[in-house]
């Protein structure tokens, strides 16, 4: 079964490789959802702990959620991203945050990819996060990351808060993967703001000072970091 699934996705791999070489795909017309948008109420079949399971946005009520899209199974950059997020899943869960990977492949393709060892040229191996199938492309379309010419999604990432509101989004073109470190830093920054009411400056990390959002109050930060008297 796995071999037949792998054979069926080979043409898709060739399409993606061709697009990466010719740069024929652009972000023209792509309008991803951004801050203050409510996350669409998606539902679909995912591979969870080696089994098929229906998951939905409603399952994550009261939690932070990072939903990230990738173009295709059995490709090149995609497994590096998915395994990197999966391997650090426990760190995100300690912050009441779940992760979902999603593409426009079928759940059978996802399962075949997960059952392929990492040592075999880009297999996923053991997954600690759900890999969601969006075979009808409704989810990618709803989040605004679907390329309608090719039927695949761009590398969109959405940070959704416990109320279901999108707080952060980014979209990469196909050839560049995303940073797990930056996703984790951004999550911690938004959670810090929610808890403390102060705002986070450029390149903030949790061992650095934040800014009190007021004309007079903010001077404390700038004196500290710029050495003003």
Swiss-Prot record:
Underlying gene: TSA1
Q: A single GO molecular function, which one?
A: thioredoxin peroxidase activity
**Could you state one GO biological process linked to this protein?**
hydrogen peroxide catabolic process
Q: Name one Pfam family in it.
A: 1-cysPrx_C
UniProt KW Disulfide bond keyword: yes
Keywords of the record: Antioxidant, Disulfide bond, Oxidoreductase, Peroxidase, Redox-active center
Chain's role: Thiol-specific peroxidase that catalyzes the reduction of hydrogen peroxide and organic hydroperoxides to water and alcohols, respectively. Plays a role in cell protection against oxidative stress by detoxifying peroxides and as sensor of hydrogen peroxide-mediated signaling events.
Query: Is Oxidoreductase among the key words of this record?
Result: yes
Q: What else is known?
A: The active site is a conserved redox-active cysteine residue, the peroxidatic cysteine (C(P)), which makes the nucleophilic attack on the peroxide substrate. The peroxide oxidizes the C(P)-SH to cysteine sulfenic acid (C(P)-SOH), which then reacts with another cysteine residue, the resolving cysteine (C(R)), to form a disulfide bridge. The disulfide is subsequently reduced by an appropriate electron donor to complete the catalytic cycle. In this typical 2-Cys peroxiredoxin, C(R) is provided by the other dimeric subunit to form an intersubunit disulfide.
InterPro entries referenced in this protein's UniProt entry, alphabetically = AhpC/TSA, Peroxiredoxin, Peroxiredoxin_AhpC-typ, Peroxiredoxin_C, Thioredoxin-like_sf, Thioredoxin_domain
Q: Which domain of life is it from?
A: Eukaryota
Q: What class of enzyme is it?
A: oxidoreductase
* The protein's Enzyme Commission number: 1.11.1.24
Entry GO CC: cytosol; mitochondrion
Q: Sorted alphabetically, which CDD domains does this protein's record hold?
A: PRX_Typ2cys
Question: This protein is called what?
Answer: Peroxiredoxin 1
The record places the active site at: 78
Q: How does it assemble?
A: Homodimer; disulfide-linked, upon oxidation.
Reactions this protein catalyses: a hydroperoxide + [thioredoxin]-dithiol = an alcohol + [thioredoxin]-disulfide + H2O
Residues in Thioredoxin domain copies: 33-192
